[in-house]
């Protein structure tokens, strides 16, 4: 579980907003699975869109900026110039989101690793579909059998 309270100074997330909107900041969070039994950071992107772009009353981020922070800025930084935007000739990696319904689910402990290994899992609501390279990989929370993605190695 990710403890956002560590940044909840003085009863406010304002300091996090300052970090998020700094021109040199990139939004990202992952331990690459190293702590799957003790940390679940899967809701970070859902929280950014639901809290900072929809629910926040002061200093709300425009939804376009939140999406850009999660997509184009990171893609450009990594040199992935065929991602992060919708345009002719680019990869069609897309999420269709119902922003009104978007919310992180409850954290669950599941035993689905080899040798009955445990991990924390957190699903989300409000993602209507996900496409990778133009192929549907999830619809209404159900993962399809399609696997059009491939490993990206940065030089």
Model-derived regions, located:
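Active-site neighborhoods of metal-dependent hydrolases
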Residues: 1-60
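Acidic, glycine-enriched loop/beta-strand segments at the rims
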Residues: 5-16, 64-65, 75-109
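C-terminal cap of metal-dependent C-N hydrolases
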Residues: 18-25, 30, 96-142, 146-147
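Hydrophobic alpha-helix feature that most strongly marks membrane-spanning transmembrane helices
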Residues: 24, 50-57, 71-75, 79, ...
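Alpha-helix capping and helix-loop boundary segments enriched in small/acidic/polar residues
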Residues: 36-40, 83, 118
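Feature captures the catalytic cores and cofactor-binding loops of soluble hydro-lyases/lyases
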Residues: 47-60, 67-69, 99-111, 126
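Acidic/polar loop patches that form or flank catalytic/metal-binding clefts of enzymes
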Residues: 60-64, 138-139
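Short, surface-exposed, low-complexity cationic segments
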Residues: 145-155
